[in-house]
């Protein structure tokens, strides 16, 4: 049985959180590692855009984002444009699923669970 290691990281720049996630993803993929992870943290203002994202969905251009102190990152995750801001709780689950094709149902189930407990 896999164990869930939950870590509260406080305020962490997106770039640092991304490096940590990539390292943990590599670790979780190892057969001998019994741990999955849930990283809980917050970022300063940042916008990310996923592989299927459309930059036309951004309301500000790169100069305007920079003027407002909002970082911008293109990521290899799915999805479109996402904003994270100071004070917003963010959870990054890094979990080895038995069936990698079931990522979307897993995410939907996680979202539903969090909404039931009003998070």
PLM ranges: what are they?
Residues 117-119:
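Conserved small/polar residues in nucleotide/adenosyl-binding loops
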Residues 1-115:
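N-terminal lobe of the biotin/lipoate ligase/transferase fold
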